[in-house]
C-alpha cells in the first residue's frame, strides 16, 4: 500500500490499526511515536539524496520499512523483556533500518548502527546530532573486522543467511544473541548447522511473524553465541560474499 500523503503521528496510527488490529494498542504502548514520525519524515526527505530506497520502495516507505521494522522490534522486545544495560548493534544498517527503531522504544537499549559505507548512514548521523538523540552510536566498519562485544545484534537485508552469522560473529560477546530478520523457511539445514558451528553459535528458537504476511513470509531466529569462532573465521568480506552468492545463502526477501 502506498504511503499516506503526509506522514504524521495520526497517519502512522491509522496504518498500524489497519495492519496490526489486534496488536496495535500494545505496539503504541511500547514506542515513542513522535520519534518514529520524525525519523520517517527524515527517511522520505533524504531518500533521493541518500539513495535509501528503490523506486518501488520509495512509494511504500511506511509499510515496507517503518512498519516492518517496528513489528520486528516489538516482537523481539516482547521476548527479551527488558533492554536495561544492553547494547544492541544493527549490522549493515544502511540509513539506520531497523536499528534506529530500537531507539524509538520508550525503554530502549544503547543502539550501535554499523555500516562500512557512509553514503546512507552519514545522513542519519546528522539527523541524530541535530535532534540531540542520545544512546545512539555509529560505527563505520566492516562487521567481520569488528570486535565490539555487543549483547545483541540484528540485521535485515544483510549478507544472505546463514553466512551473515559468520560475518557478525566477532561483534557479539559470548552469551550474546544474533537475531537475523528472514523471509521464507527455505534454508539448507546442513549448511546452517555448519556455519553456526564454525561461527560459535547455537539456534535457540525461531518465530514466524504472521502479522507481516502482507509483505510476504517473515520470520526471525534467536542464535546464541556459545564460543569464539573457529580458527580462521570469520573470513574476509570478499570470501564470505563470494560463497554466499553461490546460491547457498538466503536473505530475508527471498
Curated annotation (Swiss-Prot):
Its EC number is 2.1.1.-. The keyword S-adenosyl-L-methionine applies. It holds the Pfam family GidB. GO terms for molecular function: rRNA (guanine-N7-)-methyltransferase activity. Keywords: Cytoplasm, Methyltransferase, rRNA processing, S-adenosyl-L-methionine, Transferase. GO terms for cellular component: cytosol. S-adenosyl-L-methionine binds at residues 92, 156. InterPro entries: rRNA_ssu_MeTfrase_G, SAM-dependent_MTases_sf. The keyword Transport does not apply. It is found in: Cytoplasm. It is an enzyme of class 2 (transferase). Specifically methylates the N7 position of a guanine in 16S rRNA. Belongs to the methyltransferase superfamily. RNA methyltransferase RsmG family. This is Ribosomal RNA small subunit methyltransferase G. It comes from Leptospira borgpetersenii serovar Hardjo-bovis (strain JB197).
